[in-house]
Design a protein with these regions (language model features):
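Canonical Rossmann dinucleotide-binding motif of NAD(H)/NADP(H)-dependent dehydrogenases/reductases
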Residues: 2-33
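Short, small/polar-rich loop/turn modules that mediate ligand/substrate recognition or access, typified
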Residues: 87, 186, 191, 249-251
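Catalytic loop of short-chain dehydrogenase/reductase
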Residues: 92-93, 137-173, 178-187, 199
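Substrate-binding pocket helix/loop in short-chain dehydrogenase/reductase
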Residues: 97-114, 218
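A short, exposed helix-loop element centered on a Lys and neighboring polar residues
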Residues: 125-126, 179
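C-terminal helical subdomain
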Residues: 194, 213-249, 256-258
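Short C-terminal tail/terminal secondary-structure segment
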Residues: 250-273
Length: 273
């Protein structure tokens, strides 16, 4: 407990892994600021945290809109005085836009998927870094810690079941962005890392959760996780990256995948995308 005592953590997203992380951060003593597009989700999460005795504030914002991102960062600083940590989670599947194999993806589907999964994280990072650069280092000597959300689909694809190329490209770009940021802001003592979960029980995974063939594959592909990761398993890793326990760690991608990336198991042949 209290591994994040006295810290201010900004979390983008308000369901799934973002919600699990926000609740765990508050439980570890952090003041938590939540921002996502859906005000009802933000409010419900904030109410749960407050009911448990946590410090919390929120602002609904379209994180692909630069002005709204800036307002969210301003609100966080006004509420809690600074930003020590960012966990940038918000994003989602591009299937509703038409994401799929590249030969089937329209320009609009590509743009919409990258807007949701890459532009959002880039804009939030820019606004938060500007704030971190303007503030004094904390007692551990760092100005802040940033954790980005990647995915094993970018590095360990399973095209038979998860053939969404725009999403994979966005998540691959997140890893590149993380590395570039870590190098750029190292002299400023801002740490930047990323996590890459495999199939996790979140609203985004509803399609998989209802498909027995996908679940059977997941049980064999990520045996340490069972069918799916629990969002709190990602949240626990996030606490490490945002706490002083990782004060010398930057530029790293951690796969949280139950064995997915080292397991050569493939789905049964003939499965349609």
């Amino acid at each position: 407990m209290n591994r994040l005592a006295g810290r201010v953590c900004l979390v983008t997203g308000s369901t799934g892994m973002a919600a699990a992380a926000a609740e765990r951060f508050a439980g570890e003593g952090a003041a938590v600021f939540i921002t996502s597009r859906t005000e009802g989700h933000c409010r419900a999460l904030a109410e749960r945290i407050a009911a448990a005795g946590g410090k919390v504030a929120f602002r609904a914002a379209d994180l692909a809109n630069e002005a709204e991102v800036e307002l969210a960062v301003v609100d966080c600083v006004e509420a809690f005085g600074r930003i020590d940590s960012l966990f940038s989670v918000a994003g989602g599947s591009g299937r509703r836009f038409g994401d799929g194999p590249i030969h089937e993806v329209s320009g609009d589907a590509w743009d919409s998927t990258l807007r949701l999964n890459l532009r959002t994280q880039a804009l939030v990072c820019g606004a938060v870094v500007r704030r971190m650069l303007a503030q004094e280092p904390n007692e551990s000597g760092t100005r802040g810690s940033i954790l980005l959300m990647g995915s094993v689909t970018a590095t360990d694809p399973v095209p038979e079941l998860f053939g969404t190329h725009a999403y994979a490209a966005a998540k691959g770009a997140i890893t590149a962005l993380m590395t570039a940021m870590a190098a750029t802001y190292l002299p400023d003592r801002i740490r930047v890392n990323a996590v890459a979960p495999s199939l996790t029980r979140t609203p985004m995974a509803a399609r998989a959760a209802g498909d027995e063939q996908i679940l059977a594959f997941a049980r064999s592909k990520q045996p340490l996780a069972g069918e799916m990761l629990d969002p709190d398993e990602v949240a626990q890793a996030a606490v490490y990256f945002l706490s002083d326990e990782s004060r010398t760690v930057t530029g790293q991608l951690l796969k949280i995948d139950g064995g997915w990336s080292v397991n050569s198991v493939s789905p049964a042949p003939g499965r349609p995308l």
